[in-house]
Amino acid sequence: MSDSITIFDTTLRDGEQAPGASMTVPEKVHIAHKLADLNVDVIEAGFPISSPAQTEAVTRIATEVDGPVTCALARTKEDDIDAAGEALADGTDTRLHTFIATSDVHIEAKFDKLGNTMAEKREAIIQRAVRAIEQALTYTDNVEFSAEDAGRTDPEFLCEVVQAAAEAGATTINIPDTTGYCAPSEYTDLLETVVDCLPDPDAVTLSTHCHDDLGLATANTLAGIRAGARQVECTINGIGERAGNAALEEIVMALTVRADAFDVTADVHTEHLTPTSQTVSAATGFPVQPNKAIVGSNAFSHEAGIHQHGVLEERTTYEIMSATDVGQDAEQIRLGRHSGRHGLFNRLEAMGYAVPEGHRDALYDRFLDLADRKKEVFEEDLEQMMNDFGGDAVAAATGLPDNGVALNGGTPAYRLDQFSVHLSSDDEAKVSVRLQRDDGSAREEQATGEGPVDALYRALDHAVDAPHTLVDYSIRSISEGADAQGEVEVTIRYGENQFAGTARNTDVIRASAEAYVDALNRLVAAQEHAESVEFVQNGIMHTYGE
């Protein structure tokens, strides 16, 4: 059995299923380049049958991103397999991943047309899996099969399914704990059962895919490795459906720091973990909690006096890995208004941003404007500055999404032109706002409310044509000092879908306005490019239309 672990990153597919985490195509391509820098083995880029945007993302990543295998997801349906195969057609190193549910609860809920009895339905599921694998092999010789909700599947039936899948030619067999139900010992037993029933365990790669509903995703993944799995499916920051997926950074560093306990290797460039985490956070609008293992801002911080003393004397007293090993700074480099161009662009290059010479003047002016509003500029500020910086040339050279790009890389429907706030002595606020439309028109509205943010959002609601409901508003400081930037996150709902917007500014009222407009643009873009993906609470992806 190999001692090398295949890292299968599904941030762009399963990670995007987290409510509000939808990403534009340019954002996905940018993240895929970051994942390539990280040296992951496989990037699951999307689910092509679901929408043109998903197809475009898969095709662009397959043709533009060198290094990792590009994977596309498909149900065990002919149209799905064809859509995935065609999206991958121009790629040089590709995989097609097909799946079908195998647990009794899924079979009873989703497969009425496959038979009258459970036995008939199970037999039909095996036949569909085999046909799908055979069809997928006409597009690529790298085919993965997943038994959705394997964690709650009858072990005997699971063995029948994976045996048939292996005999049909699947090269990777994935055993998902789709609902995060398994305990580590149970998941170990399940994978050992699968290994024992495979006709030739060395002929296929056994894979894990663990969700975090009980907080056990990383533990179950590591248990799966001990049971013989040699591929792990995971996401940056652990994002994903419901409580999320196993976090790539946690798995990789567990295997690195505790190599003695697992005796396997993952060839990941760990110094890129934190920069990649920050990129995904900026694209999705999901902040990384400070105490998040490996990539959180507090992961290498010490406040207790005895800990500080110990670390100053010898870092290994309280640290089992180095901050620099995972791309965090042992000592934060601070920039300010007196920082020169050399210092700024050296720092940006260290963060992974190679800005073309022709665009450096504009970016340096943006930096000076920020530095004038803040005494010190931190890495978090620079990350957001680069995420916000517009221009097709810079976007092409750096992989950055253009400023304000909507889904599929289109022009955003709304741009905040100007606004003003007037406060009265009785705490009532009056706001005037002007929005610029993508057709060149502008609309001005006024509103009053209980405080500036309430009034601002009422005015914006009057100025837009997209019906929606405000679900959540939060603000936090994302850099240091009294002049710190505030990051505002806004979530709005339209129907069953949620859309998240974020913005950062030293002026939190402006950040509140820009975050709301960001969320509105994502809503409008989603309506224009009507995604046909259907998500459910308890699955990898809803198997609709069966």
Curated annotation (Swiss-Prot):
Alphabetized InterPro entries for the sequence: 2-IPM_HCS-like, 2-isopropylmalate_synth_dimer, AIPM/Hcit_synth_CS, Aldolase_TIM, LeuA/HCS_post-cat, LeuA_allosteric_dom_sf, LeuA_bact_synth, PYR_CT
Gene3D superfamilies named in the record: 1.10.238.260, 3.30.160.270, Aldolase class I
Regulatory domain: region residues: 415-546
PROSITE patterns registered for this protein in UniProt: AIPM_HOMOCIT_SYNTH_1, AIPM_HOMOCIT_SYNTH_2, PYR_CT
Gene Ontology cellular-component terms listed: cytoplasm
UniProtKB keywords: Amino-acid biosynthesis, Branched-chain amino acid biosynthesis, Cytoplasm, Leucine biosynthesis, Manganese, Metal-binding, Transferase
Substrates-to-products reaction catalysed: 3-methyl-2-oxobutanoate + acetyl-CoA + H2O = (2S)-2-isopropylmalate + CoA + H(+)
Family from the record: Belongs to the alpha-IPM synthase/homocitrate synthase family. LeuA type 1 subfamily.
Assembly notes: Homodimer.
Name of this protein: 2-isopropylmalate synthase
